[in-house]
Structure formats: C-alpha cells, structure tokens
C-alpha cells in the first residue's frame, strides 16, 4: 500500500507564502472579477430549463369540435408529426378553436423549431378550409406557463370595444416587441366590429335568404388594387369608394330590389357597432375589463423581461385617454425577487454563523480573520465563472453558495489548525506555514476532488431535472475549487504573517473557559473511543444497522417531486354543467368572484369566460387569484386554497379547481390541478367506455383529491338531419344548408374593414332574441333552384343529441387527461402507486394506453434514476479516492461513513414531515461529500503516523482521531450552520430551500456522532483484512 507523501517544504503553497504581495494582488483580482460578475449576472427564480415549446392557434368561428378536429387540427397534426426533434404534440379542438402545443427536445434550439413549425403550417395551408378567417398563428410560448405579468385595462367613459382597440394597437404590439416576450393575449373579446343581426321574419317575407345578404355585403365592401394611369406628363393612381367603414354605411347598403324599390340592409337587420365575438368576457375583480396576459418565450429571462415591460408602461399609458386606467394586477417577478433576496440573506447569515463557529473554536481574532476572508473570497470569485457559463443568480445557485459556505471554510480551517499546531510547538510562523501547508496539501486536494466527484453524476442527469441541477452542481464545484486554491495560497500566506505564539497564547476568560471545555470533550471522546476500539464487532454491528435502517427508511419515506411553492398566485378553473351558455357561465363566474374577493388573503382577481387558446368550452372559466404579499397575510397558499374551495362550494352548480403557480413548469397545457394522468385510445368510443369507469375508481382513492377529467361528452347538439333526396329535388346542396346555418348562428366573419391602424370584421348572424333555443332553426330559409324560398324544416328534422365539448389529441390519437391533487397526509409517490394499482384492476384493453404527464412523469423518471444517481456518486468518489490513496481498501473505509448520513437525513425529513423530493435527494448526495471528510482527515494522519513514526495501526488511528477531533468538529459544525438558515427559512420560496437544509442538518448531526467511533473501528478491521490477505498470498507463494 502506497500513499503519496506530503511535502515538508510547503509544496504548491511555498511560492505564494514567500510572495505575499503577488498573492494579495491575485486574490484582489479574483475579488474584483467576482464583483463585476455579480453585477452582470441576470436574476431568475430557477435556471432556465424550459423545453422549446410552440403553440399554434387556429380560430374558425362557428365550427363544432368535430369540424375543428377533422378540418383543421388533423391536417396540421399530420404535418407537424413529420418534424424532427418533436418530443410531444398535444391538441385541443373545441367550438371554433384549435390549439396545438408542440414540445421539442431540450437540445433543439427554439429558433430551429420555429422554422420547422412555419414550414409545416405552409405545407398544410391547402388542406385547411377555404373560408378560414385567418391562417394558423404560432407563438413561442408554453401555454401552461403562467403569465409573467397580468394587466387590467378599464374605463369608466369608453366602451370596451374602443378600449381593446387602443390597447391592441398602442400597447400590446409594443410589449410584444420586447425581447423575451413570447405572447401577449388580450382576454375579454371586445375587439371592435360591425355586427349585422338579420331579422329572419323580415327577410323571409321579402323572399330573401341570409346568403343573399352575405353576398351583397361581401360584394359591397372590397379593398383591392385598381391600377393607375400613366400619361405623357402625369401619373394618376386610381381609387374608389369601395370601402364601407361604419355601421351607418352598412345600414344604407342596398341588398336587393323589389318592384323597383330598393331594400336596404337596415330594413331587414339591426346593424350596430359591437364586439367581434359576443361570447367572450373578462373581469378584473368585479369590473369588466380587457385583461392583458404577458407570457415569456421559453428560455427568456423573466426578470429582465418584466423590467423592460415596466420601463415601457409609463410611456405607453401616456398615449391613452385619461379615462382609461391600466393596472398591474400581478407580477411574478415580485415574488421571485423576494425569494432571491431571502436566499441572499440566508447566504449572509450562513457566512456569519460560520465565522462565529470559527472564532468559538480558535478563540483568536487573527486566526478568525483568515477564514473570514477566505470564505467570501471563494464565494464572490464564483460569480466570475458563472458569468462565463451563462448562469444566473437564482434560488438554486444561491442555495449552492449557501451550502458551499460550510464546505469552503473546511479547507481554510484544516490549514489554519495544522499551521497553528506547529506555531504552538515553538516554530516560527513562516516555517510553521511552510511545514503545515506542505503537510496538509494532499489532504486539501483529497477533500476537494473527492467532493467534486460526488457532484459529477448530477452533471449527467437526463431530461429537465438534470438541466435544472446542472447550474447547482457546477456552481458548488466551482466554489469548492476556488476554495481549495485560496486555502493553498492566501490562507497559509496570511497565517505566516498574522499568527504568532503570542497571538495564539493570548487568552481571555472566555478563551480559557472554552479551552478547558474542549479539553474535557476531547478527553471524554478519547475514553469512549478506547472502549469502542476494544469492542470492534459491536461497533461494526451498529454501522451495519445504520445501513439497514437507511434502506428501510428509503423504502418507506413519502416521496415527492418538487416542493409546492407559495408564489402568491393561484390559477383556477371553474366548471359548470356542460350545457351552460355564455350568459349563464358569466353570471356564475361573477358569483364565484364575489365570494373569492371576500377572503382576507386575496388582493385581486381576474377571470375569463369564453372559448380561446386556453379555455376549451363555454361551460368553463379561467381565474387568476393574486394573493397579498406573504408578510401581509396569515396563511400560506395551501391553506388559502382550502378556505376558498370551502367558500365556493356554497355556490350551486359549479366546481372550482385551484392550484398554486410554480416556478418550474413542465406541463404543456393548463390543468385544473397539479398532476395529470392520461388515457389514450384509437377512438373516442373507447375513451367514452373506460374513462367513466376509471374516474369512478380514482375518486374513491384516499391518496387522491380533486379528481377531475377533461372528458366532456354531454354537450348539447342540435343535429340537422337533412333529407338529401328532398333537398336534391329542390336543387339545394349540403353546402347551401351549411352556409345558411353558418350565416345565422356562427358569428360569421363575412367581410373586413381596412384602416390605417388595424383591420375590423363585419359579423353576420340572426337576431335570436325573439326566437331563443331550437326554435331559431325554424326561421332558416334556403333558395331552391327555381328561385323560391324553402324553409329548412321542410327538408330536415332537428334531433337533440350529446357530443363532446372538446376533442383532445396526444401525438395524433384521442386522449383524455385526468387531473388530481394529493392530500396533505399522502405523498405523490403514494398517489402514483395507487393509480397504477387501480389501473391493473380494471384490465384495460390493449388499444388503451396510460401515461403520467408533466411533473408526475418527471417524478417517475427522477425516482427511477435516484438510486443509480447515488450509486454513481459513491462509485465516482471511490475511484477518485482510490487514485489519490493508491489503495483499494482505504476508500472503502472512508465510504463506510455514508449510511450514517443517509439515516440522519431521512430521519430528519420524517420528523419534519417533509417528503423525499429531488431537493432533499440533492442534500443527501452533498452529505456523501461532507461526511467522508471526517474519515479522510482521520485516515490521512493515521497513515502518516504509521509511515513516519512507526506506530501500530491502533495507536495511529487513535492518535489521529484525537488530533483531528477539533478540526473535524469545527468543519462539521461549520457545514451544519451553513445549512441551518436554509432549514429555518420562512420567507418567499422557503418551501424550495427547506428540504435541503433539513436533510443536511439531520445527516450531519447523526453522522458526526457515529463516524467518530465507527471509522477508526472499520479502519482497523480493514487493516487486519489487508494483513490477512497479504499473509495468504505470501503462504501461497512459499508453497509454490
């Protein structure tokens, strides 16, 4: 067994000890680079790990979900399905709207995905309906990603149509141009239009049809090229009064003549300025408004984007009339900044606690100043590297630096403690620094690279979780590496200049009392260690028991994915009976809004009713509830949600589903609850059979709550069953029937009014105020081949049926999504297992496939790779330690400390009521790196004592344990206090930080107590094993 010998001449530290000016200037350069880097780093909630996502929206007013699916969604899906790099394609086809969400592989640049989407849309153009009002529009945005900012525009003096027109032309377009903005949506549906409401009885009495009126309007309002005249000396451009701009002009339009008398549009219709879609509405609190939601592009920095919007807003609002009020209702960056500020405060607190524990142990101001300089220098220097790596200041990188506080101080402590030992023995400070730094240099290198080795597996984690923690791992590794450099350069140089026998021996009353206390603790530890060494097998059984206990705890501890954060914003979905109309839904929504706004934690509320890119049907409404800042309300978001749901339960005929918005968004669709599970089949019939059965089972599970499905197949349909023979005999085609129905009930966009600033539509429909419901179909008239007027009822029968309100696809096949939450007394792991067990009992046919989606799918993936991740971390550390020690045995001795860390972390999580989520798992992996430091410091000195002083293994490890007890205790407490602010955090984003702190504090406490006794015992056992192995080999060689 060979060990690399430590240098007695200062090793790599010698040059820096002997050149203090150069060392000081080098450290100043690192400090300045870090400060400049800190100022240049962007701020965000989490690392940018979004999947490249593009949403394609196609609007076809009046089309049923079935028509939207077959005529619009399917042709587009076929083209999109051929794109390379596509990870998942989901679509939702509802009345008048098709929304397709395309999620690409993480490695595909968003700009490349955009080019492929545009090419696919172009290829599908010829397959789409010819009367589609507008071509498909794509946006580089994830629809499930909550808006970064929500603004409400209201006015007490102007109609909403004029307000929306101004907002669209003067505000929304400018905000859309800001870098990082992916989509600006205006909810409220008050876009100006000229609405033509036909009087069915009037046109029937005159022998006219709606098609006659439509043809007259489209022919009277045109905007096309007319050419120019080019004479010998002058050129003249041709123009004409071919455009009609106002409702009054349309009223005067002559649509036909009877007996030589003109029939004007105003004679048979009500023509008025109105909204393009009367089945859309938005409210801010209790006031009707135009709600502007700003969503970012995937990968864009949310803070800089929001800052740019706020800088532009005053300029934009100045262009609006004074009666128009623009209010910022929600800004996600407010909570993000608060969370980052809290994490920065916890970082400073960790530094202060670490410096305090150093002084408590060293009891010497100069000796305390040295690590007090090394710690912030290592952390600040990390910022410079983060800039070059395109990182950001976010919760995870700041958590990495907070944890690094306990790590980076370890190196400085080890160096100072070793140099101080030689100074106290009477050596000169310079000689002691050279000798102490040279002796400890190999230990520092071992500690550093073995700790970085633990982080290596995090860099190779796949999918979005790996991307998420890459910044965390690299930031921590860089801080540790800079710390090692500082500890081998600045720290010994400062020790040589600042420490002396007089300063170290200078004691006050506190120093003397604490020194006596430490001496008593070391003496007690020595007595206990001697007893333990005399009973090695009992100690070994304790070590094996911790290994078994850690495995049992791992199996039984509740498991989750990502902590649920309180960001102060709640997303809500309001569900009413499937036959609800727009007016009915708007009334129910206002009732619910009144209840919600009475809650003391609610600051504001926006709501939307109607069908658009995020809301699939008229019987549902979207809500965004903005809570007061955390310090202004008594309860956190989960309690507020429970209270709101209880209050809304008293409103009859509606179901409310609420979930808090999260910084990490993996889903690609707006969901009712936090977690999703999908059923996919080859036909809608198969889904209609099995979805109700599965829903019934899942709603009975105690592990699930708020179980709901987007399967809605009880929408009322008036099925027009045309007698094709009769229609053909009269010369009426099915196209004529469809056109007549579309003209009457589809809010048909029949013409466009062009202005210098915008384009507006002419909307055709029947006035159904006097003939509500199915009776309106009796007023439909068609033109026969001989010019006569034929009632629809003479060639068709009307049947009332049920049909889906929306048709959803996943990768081109019908799918339904089951959403659910997890009750407080269960974990996501419990819920996932319960769903899988239930699925098995149903014996689903082979043509139905099930899959978890979004964060639930990511949880499954992360859970499956967690064990391998920890194994990889242990293997990586073993390889590094084996190379450093040139031994197969000593790395095993060092790694034997790991089960104690696992037991402590898991027990702490159980006691605190926290789940084992990905944050806690990262803490356990870091514990692997921290805990083994104790063993490294013991074994390094034991091997040196055996080699240089000829001690027996037992005496060597005994002396090493006593000699290194103080620095071991100091470094462990430093790491513990570095994690303590995270464990005790209560501010914004505390849910994210607390599991890491809990796991690390618990693991450090238990491992500190156990490893001080188990490590020396295992060292001796492996030493005996090595001797026995050598003797066996020697005997075999002699016999040979």
Curated annotation (Swiss-Prot):
GO terms for cellular component: plasma membrane. It is found in: Cell inner membrane. Induction: The mdtABC operon is transcriptionally activated by BaeR. Keywords: Cell inner membrane, Cell membrane, Membrane, Transmembrane, Transmembrane helix, Transport. It is a multi-pass membrane protein. It comes from the Bacteria. GO terms for molecular function: xenobiotic transmembrane transporter activity. Pfam families: ACR_tran. The chain crosses the membrane at residues 25-45, 347-367, 369-389, 396-416, 440-460, 472-492, 537-557, 863-883, 888-908, 911-931, 968-988, 998-1018. Part of a tripartite efflux system composed of MdtA, MdtB and MdtC. MdtB forms a heteromultimer with MdtC. The MdtABC tripartite complex confers resistance against novobiocin and deoxycholate. Belongs to the resistance-nodulation-cell division (RND) (TC 2.A.6) family. MdtB subfamily. PANTHER family: MULTIDRUG RESISTANCE PROTEIN MDTB (PTHR32063:SF21), PTHR32063. This is Multidrug resistance protein MdtB. It comes from Escherichia coli O127:H6 (strain E2348/69 / EPEC). The gene is mdtB.
């Amino acid at each position: 067994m060979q060990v690399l010998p430590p240098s007695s001449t200062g090793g790599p530290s010698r040059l820096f000890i002997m050149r203090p000016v150069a060392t000081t200037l080098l450290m100043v350069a690192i400090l300045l680079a870090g400060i400049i880097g800190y100022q240049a780093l962007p701020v965000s909630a989490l690392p940018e790990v979004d999947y490249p996502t593009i949403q394609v929206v196609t609007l076809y007013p009046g089309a049923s979900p079935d028509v939207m699916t077959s005529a619009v969604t399917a042709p587009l899906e076929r083209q999109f399905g051929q794109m390379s790099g596509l990870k998942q394609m989901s679509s939702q086809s509802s009345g008048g709207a098709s929304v397709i969400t395309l999620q690409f592989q993480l490695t595909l640049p968003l700009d490349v995905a955009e080019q492929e989407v545009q090419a696919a849309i172009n290829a599908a153009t010829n397959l789409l309906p010819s009367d589609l009002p507008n071509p498909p529009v794509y946006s580089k945005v994830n629809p499930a990603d909550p808006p970064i900012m929500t603004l409400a525009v209201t006015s007490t003096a102007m109609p909403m149509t004029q307000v929306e027109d101004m907002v669209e032309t003067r505000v929304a377009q400018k905000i859309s141009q800001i870098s990082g903005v992916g989509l600006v949506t205006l909810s409220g549906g008050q876009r100006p239009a000229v609405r033509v409401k036909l009087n069915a009885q009037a046109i029937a009495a005159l022998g006219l049809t709606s098609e006659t009126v439509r043809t007259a309007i489209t022919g009277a309002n045109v905007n096309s090229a007319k050419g120019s005249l080019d004479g010998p000396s002058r050129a003249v451009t041709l123009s004409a009064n071919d455009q009609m701009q106002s409702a009054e002009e349309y009223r005067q339009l002559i649509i036909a003549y009877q007996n030589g008398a003109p029939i004007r549009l105003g004679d048979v219709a009500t023509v008025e300025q109105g909204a393009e879609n009367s089945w859309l509405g938005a409210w801010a609190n209790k006031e009707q408004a135009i709600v502007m939601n700003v969503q970012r592009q995937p990968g864009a920095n949310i803070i800089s984007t929001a800052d740019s919007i706020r800088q532009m807003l005053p300029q934009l609002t100045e262009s609006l009339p004074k009666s128009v009020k623009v209010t910022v209702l929600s800004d996600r960056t407010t909570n993000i900044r608060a969370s980052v500020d809290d994490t920065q405060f916890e970082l400073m607190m960790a530094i202060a606690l670490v410096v305090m524990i150093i002084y408590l142990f060293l009891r010497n101001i100069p000796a305390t100043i040295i690590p007090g300089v090394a710690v912030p220098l290592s952390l600040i220097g990390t910022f410079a590297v983060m800039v070059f790596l395109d990182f950001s200041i976010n919760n995870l990188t700041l958590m990495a630096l907070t944890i690094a506080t306990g790590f980076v101080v370890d190196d400085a402590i080890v160096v100072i403690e070793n140099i101080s030992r030689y100074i106290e023995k009477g050596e000169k400070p310079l000689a002691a620094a050279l000798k102490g730094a040279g002796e400890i240099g190999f230990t520092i290198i071992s500690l550093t690279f073995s700790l970085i080795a633990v982080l290596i597996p995090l860099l190779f984690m796949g999918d979005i979780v790996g991307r998420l923690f890459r910044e965390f791992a690299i930031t921590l590794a860089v801080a540790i590496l800079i710390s090692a450099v500082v500890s081998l350069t600045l720290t010994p140089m400062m020790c040589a200049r600042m420490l002396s026998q007089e300063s170290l021996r200078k004691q006050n009353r506190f120093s003397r009392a604490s020194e006596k206390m430490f001496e008593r603790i070391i003496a007690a530890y020595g007595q206990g260690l001697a007893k333990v060494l005399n009973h090695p097998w009992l100690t070994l059984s304790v070590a094996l028991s911790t290994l078994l206990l850690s495995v049992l705890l791992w199996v039984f501890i509740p498991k989750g994915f990502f902590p649920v954060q309180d960001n102060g914003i709640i997303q809500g979905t309001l569900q009413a009976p499937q036959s609800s109309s727009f007016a009915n839904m708007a009334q129910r929504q206002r009732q619910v809004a009144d209840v919600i706004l009475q809650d003391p934690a609610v600051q504001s509320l926006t709501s939307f009713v109607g069908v658009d890119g995020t809301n699939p049907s008229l019987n549902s409404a979207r809500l965004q509830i903005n809570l007061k800042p955390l310090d202004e309300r008594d309860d956190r978001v989960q309690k507020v949600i429970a209270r709101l749901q209880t209050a809304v339960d008293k409103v009859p005929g509606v179901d409310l589903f609420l979930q808090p918005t999260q910084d990490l968004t993996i889903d690609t669709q707006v969901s009712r609850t936090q977690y999703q599970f999908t059923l996919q089949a080859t036909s809608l019939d198969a889904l209609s059979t099995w979805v109700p059965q599965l829903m019934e089972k899942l709603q009975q599970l105690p592990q699930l709550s708020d179980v709901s499905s987007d399967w809605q197949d009880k929408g009322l349909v008036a099925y027009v069953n045309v007698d094709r023979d009769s229609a053909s005999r009269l010369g009426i085609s099915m196209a004529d029937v469809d056109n007549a129905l579309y003209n009457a009930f589809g809010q048909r966009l029949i013409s466009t009014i062009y202005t210098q600033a915008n384009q507006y539509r002419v909307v055709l429909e029947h006035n159904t105020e006097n003939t509500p419901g199915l009776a309106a179909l009796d007023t439909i008239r068609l033109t026969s081949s001989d010019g006569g007027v034929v009632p629809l009822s003479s060639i068709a029968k009307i049947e009332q049926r049920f049909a889906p309100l929306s048709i959803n696809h996943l990768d081109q096949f019908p799918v339904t999504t089951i959403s659910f939450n997890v009750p407080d007394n269960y974990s996501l792991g419990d819920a996932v297992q319960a769903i899988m067990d239930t699925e098995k009992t149903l014996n689903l046919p082979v043509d139905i496939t099930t899959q978890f989606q979004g964060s639930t799918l990511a949880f499954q993936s992360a859970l499956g790779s967690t064990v391998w991740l920890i194994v990889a971390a242990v293997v990586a550390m073993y390889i590094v330690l084996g190379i450093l020690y040139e031994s197969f045995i000593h790395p095993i001795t060092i790694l034997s400390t790991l089960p104690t860390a696992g037991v402590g972390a898991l027990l702490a999580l159980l006691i605190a009521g926290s789940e084992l989520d990905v944050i806690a798992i990262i803490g356990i992996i870091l514990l692997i790196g921290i805990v083994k430091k104790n063993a490294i410091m013991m074994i390094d000195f034991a091997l040196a004592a055996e080699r240089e002083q000829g001690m027996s293994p037992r005496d060597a490890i005994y002396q090493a344990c006593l000699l290194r007890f103080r620095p071991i205790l100091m470094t462990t407490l430093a790491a513990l206090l570095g994690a303590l602010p995270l464990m005790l955090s209560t501010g914004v984003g505390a849910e994210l930080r607390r599991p890491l702190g809990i796991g690390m504090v618990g693991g450090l406490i238990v491992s500190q107590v156990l490893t001080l006794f188990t490590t020396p015992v295992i060292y001796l056992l492996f030493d005996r094993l090595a001797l026995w192995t050598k003797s066996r080999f020697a005997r075999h060689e002699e016999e040979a």
